[in-house]
């Protein structure tokens, strides 16, 4: 209602939604989700979101490339037996002007998309997370499916958070057979717990930490802007990634020094150790301590070979 009242034209609404999703970074829940796909536990996603975070997660954390459908005309070509991951946008994509962003628009679901949702629910169960059930078009389909014996035979699992407002339609739905309310702390915590229960070991993304985009994403995760460190599973994984990132930084530093034979062979052992110590503080993001140490070591060093190395560290800081 608010979007339609403020933006009359579909193109205006698209630009508004685009401005809201632009520059968003992936939270750790996406990494867990994609790893479940990589391990063969998930494959198909129906989403009401306009953003491209799910697609971006595949590009960062998987070698698999998903089939993405944001138009009614394109969804017919999706095969239920295809092994490729599938993303079907129920209300469109923000890149196109025909996104369904108003109440009137979301009251209807395109026929081909509706049929594809029904088709998949005949073969598979359904996990619903991050969705309030306020779109009549989608809820009508789900209500219909829960009344059919040969659909959702593997169950419908609806994730809720404590304190969520449950509308009357959803409340009635949760009382149906094969429909199970699941209380979760949030998107990230749910996929962390699911991953922990199904997959042994961590996320396995440390080998890509040298890639700038992944490094930026992991750095955002480690900033804990969403307060996820209180979750034991997530904290353990982020601590592990932080340790791996530190080891990679130190390894890169050693490689950089070792690659210059003239420098590495002529560095006094004390300066070599000092530079390693500075590198370790940089890896820990303790830039103040690294800077102070580099300045002190520069002033105390008597090596003409080492001094430029200290200056390079100071410049990088």
Annotate each PLM feature.
Residues 92-113:
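A short, charged helix-loop
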Residues 2-65, 99-102:
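Metabolite-binding pocket within alpha/beta catalytic cores that recognizes anionic/polar moieties
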Residues 50, 92, 131:
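Active-site metal-binding loops of divalent metal-dependent hydrolases
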Residues 81, 85-92:
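Class I SAM-dependent methyltransferase SAM-binding "motif I" and its flanking Rossmann-like core
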Residues 71-72:
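Phosphate-binding loop that captures ATP/GTP phosphates
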Residues 38-43, 61-66, 76-83, 114-316:
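SIR2/sirtuin-family catalytic core signature
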Residues 23-27, 106-110, 135:
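A conditional alpha-helix N-cap/helix-loop micro-motif detector
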Residues 47, 91, 160:
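Short beta-strand/turn micro-motifs composed of small residues
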């Amino acid at each position: 209602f608010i979007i339609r009242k403020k933006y009359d034209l579909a193109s205006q609404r698209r630009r508004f939604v685009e401005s809201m999703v632009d520059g968003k970074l992936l939270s750790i829940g996406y990494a867990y989700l994609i790893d479940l796909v990589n391990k063969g536990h998930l494959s198909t996603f129906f989403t009401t979101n306009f953003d491209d975070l799910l697609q971006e997660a595949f590009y960062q954390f998987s070698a698999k490339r998903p089939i993405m459908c944001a138009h009614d005309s394109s969804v017919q070509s999706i095969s239920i037996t295809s092994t490729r991951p599938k993303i079907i946008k129920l209300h469109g994509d923000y890149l196109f002007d025909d996104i369904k962003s108003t109440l009137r628009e979301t009251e209807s679901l395109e026929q081909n998309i509706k049929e594809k949702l029904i088709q998949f629910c005949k073969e598979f169960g359904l996990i619903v997370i991050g969705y309030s059930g306020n779109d009549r078009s989608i809820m009508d389909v789900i209500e219909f499916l829960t009344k059919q014996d040969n659909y959702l035979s593997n169950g419908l699992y609806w994730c809720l958070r404590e304190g969520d407002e449950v509308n009357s339609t959803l409340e009635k739905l949760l009382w149906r057979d094969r429909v199970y309310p699941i209380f979760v702390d949030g998107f990230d915590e749910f996929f962390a717990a699911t991953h922990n229960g199904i997959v042994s070991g961590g996320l396995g993304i440390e080998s890509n930490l040298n890639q700038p985009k992944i490094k930026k994403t992991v750095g955002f995760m480690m900033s804990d802007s969403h307060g996820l460190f209180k979750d034991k599973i997530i904290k353990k994984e982020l601590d592990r990634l932080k340790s791996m990132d530190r080891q990679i930084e130190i390894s890169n530093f050693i490689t950089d020094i070792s690659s210059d034979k003239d420098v590495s062979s002529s560095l006094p052992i004390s300066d070599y150790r000092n530079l390693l110590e500075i590198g370790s503080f940089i890896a820990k993001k303790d830039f103040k301590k690294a800077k102070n140490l580099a300045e002190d070591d520069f002033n105390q060093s008597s090596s003409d070979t080492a001094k430029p190395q200290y200056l390079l560290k100071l410049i990088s800081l």
